[in-house]
Every structure is written in C-alpha cells, then in structure tokens.
C-alpha cells in the first residue's frame, strides 16, 4: 500500500507538508515551494526549490520554507543555492521530473492507480 499524507506545517494555515513515497514536498498556499528526496538505498538527501519563488514577498512562505529546510534564514538558503546544495527547478510544472525520475503529477497518479491507496487531506489544493 502506498500512502500520501498531508499535514499543516507547524499547524500553520496554508502551509503544507506532503509526504509521498518519493520524498517530502512543502506547499505554500497553492504552490509547491520545495522538495526533499532520498537517492535510492544510500539515503543521500537532495533538495529542490521552485525556481519561481518570489523572494521578496509572502513572508509566511519564506518563514516556513526555512523551517522546512532547517535553515536559520533566507540568506542561508540563498547561500546553499549558490553553492549547489539546493537545486532550482520548476516544481509547479506538473511534468517537471525530480531526481528520482518522476514528476509530482506522476507520483499522485501512480498512487491513485494502485489497488489500495489512502490519502489524507487537510485543506490541500492540487492544481
């Protein structure tokens, strides 16, 4: 059985963690902002941030992005982008492939197609 579990990040309205078999997504309002995944069996973590993030607005989004990433502030996040620790991709294009080779849309479709699946939604809006 494959599960997708959705919860509010630290109980915050409009800030969501989406747990999937492929990894963990952070969604703010209606946009995917970040993804953390693991490379196969060696558990090497990789992180993608959406390349359309507006760094100058939505202070709540930036606050919860830092919490999701474990960064102290946005300056630290920007430094990790600069040094290659985080990669920028278009997470909100449903066909964008993540490192594991699947898009967010494909992950959800695959789970829905399986004979037994369970999704728990707490206010999540899929595009």
Spans of features found by a protein language model:
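Terminal leader/tail segments of proteins
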Residues: 1-127
């Amino acid at each position: 059985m494959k599960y997708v579990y959705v919860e509010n990040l630290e109980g915050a309205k409009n800030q969501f963690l989406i747990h999937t078999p492929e990894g963990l997504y952070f969604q703010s309002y209606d946009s995917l902002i970040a993804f953390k995944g693991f490379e196969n069996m060696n558990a090497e973590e990789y992180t993608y941030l959406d390349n359309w993030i507006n760094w100058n607005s939505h202070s709540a989004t930036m606050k919860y992005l830092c919490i999701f990433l474990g960064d102290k502030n946005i300056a630290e996040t920007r430094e990790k982008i600069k040094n290659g620790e985080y990669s920028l991709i278009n997470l909100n294009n449903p066909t964008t492939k993540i490192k594991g080779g699947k898009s967010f849309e494909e992950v959800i479709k695959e789970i829905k197609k399986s004979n037994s699946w369970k999704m728990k939604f707490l206010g999540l809006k899929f595009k």
